[in-house]
């Protein structure tokens, strides 16, 4: 079993703090993307809304989440010991699982995969943000 990512908040306050900290970075990322696209200041004002910057912040937060990567057996062992309610997405008859738990919410999400680790991690992080953190941050 291994870990991908580094952020595993211990509390709702820690999650909110991290999310808020990504605000300025999200603004810079969006501004630089707009520049790279060759849009002028007028187009920036018209097209870049607070929702665009918020989406960038959501992605930055989600992509920083720590995710456990392991076999189905390792996941089932972990699941037997956790107090979290686990939401599992994906096919049941595969060899590997990625998961993220937020014990302070008593929730965890997991995604199964066979070969595409990178895709599974991305899917899981989006699921974790949507199912766990959206209401917290």
What annotation goes with each model-predicted range?
Residues 1-137:
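Acidic, polar-rich N-terminal leader regions of halophilic archaeal proteins
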């Amino acid at each position: 079993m291994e870990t991908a990512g580094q952020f595993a908040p211990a509390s709702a306050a820690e999650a909110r703090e991290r999310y808020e900290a990504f605000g300025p970075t999200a603004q810079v990322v969006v501004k630089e993307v707009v520049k790279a696209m060759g849009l002028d200041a007028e187009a920036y004002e018209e097209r870049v809304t607070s929702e665009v910057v918020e989406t960038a912040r959501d992605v930055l937060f989600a992509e920083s989440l720590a995710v456990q990567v392991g076999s189905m057996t390792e996941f089932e062992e972990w699941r037997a010991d956790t107090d979290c309610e686990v939401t599992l997405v994906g096919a049941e008859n595969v060899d590997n699982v990625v998961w993220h738990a937020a014990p302070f919410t008593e929730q965890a999400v997991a995604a199964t995969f066979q070969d595409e680790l990178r895709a599974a991690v991305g899917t899981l992080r989006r699921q974790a943000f949507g199912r766990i953190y959206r209401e917290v941050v």
